[in-house]
């Protein structure tokens, strides 16, 4: 399971405690071996002297991306660049590119396998509160802003992350944007969030899973 503090919730849903192992969610080791921000920006061609907002929409390009992009552009200046990972949603990407064809600070990107580098390069990340992407963001230690969740498990993700200082969010789209921009402009708040991510995150979950499985195998062999 993602974290030991969630053990009681799983037990209440009928799963025996002895079946629960709080390893965290495994992520690619690419998120654990990231370059420094300046180096990542150099690799991606992102200006070193600009603020960088990263927006991830998921591989299918879901979310209120057009509305949020418009508000972020309106409420930031020329010193802030916005990078949108548009996934495979060609219609969304075309709409955004047409809308912002006259500005050099909105960058609409195709599906990429370099999300880890963009996280390393970004000052803050706006993303839907899916479990895997959120865990990757914590592993990358990027200041995290959760957008509107899908009712259900994503609601719980937002609650857990915000309660533990690992992200900010809001009840409305405007509140999400305001809280995100406040975080962007507050390096001390970003640093504090990274401390919380380091404290509560489990970036080495894959190792923990392997160790548990190997331990179970060894125990079974000893009993045989």
Tell what function each PLM region has:
Residues 122-123, 141-143:
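A short alpha->beta transition loop at the rim of the catalytic pocket in nucleotide-sugar-dependent
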Residues 6-10, 92-96, 133, 152-158:
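Short, glycine/polar-rich helix-capping loops at beta-to-alpha or helix-loop-helix junctions
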Residues 36, 168, 173-174, 181-198, ...:
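Conserved donor-nucleotide binding/catalytic region of nucleotide-linked donor-dependent transferases
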């Amino acid at each position: 399971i993602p974290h030991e503090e969630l053990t009681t919730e799983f037990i209440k849903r009928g799963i025996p405690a002895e079946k629960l192992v709080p390893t965290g969610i495994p992520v690619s080791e690419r998120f654990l071996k990231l370059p420094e921000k300046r180096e990542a920006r150099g690799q991606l061609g992102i200006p070193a002297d600009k603020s960088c907002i990263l927006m991830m929409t998921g591989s299918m390009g879901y979310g209120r991306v057009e509305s949020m992009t418009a508000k972020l552009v309106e409420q930031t200046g020329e010193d802030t660049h916005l990078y949108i990972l548009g996934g495979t949603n060609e219609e969304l990407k075309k709409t955004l590119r047409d809308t912002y064809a006259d500005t050099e600070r909105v960058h609409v990107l195709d599906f990429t396998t370099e999300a880890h580098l963009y996280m390393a390069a970004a000052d803050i990340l706006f993303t839907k509160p899916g479990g895997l992407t959120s865990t990757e963001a914590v592993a990358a230690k990027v200041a995290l802003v959760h957008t509107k969740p899908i009712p259900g498990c994503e609601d719980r993700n937002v609650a857990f992350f915000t309660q533990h200082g690992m992200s900010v969010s809001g009840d409305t789209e405007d509140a999400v944007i305001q809280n995100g921009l406040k975080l962007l402009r507050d390096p001390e708040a970003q640093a504090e969030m990274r401390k919380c991510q380091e404290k509560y995150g489990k970036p080495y979950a894959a190792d923990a899973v392997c160790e548990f499985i190997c331990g179970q195998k060894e125990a079974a062999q000893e009993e045989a």
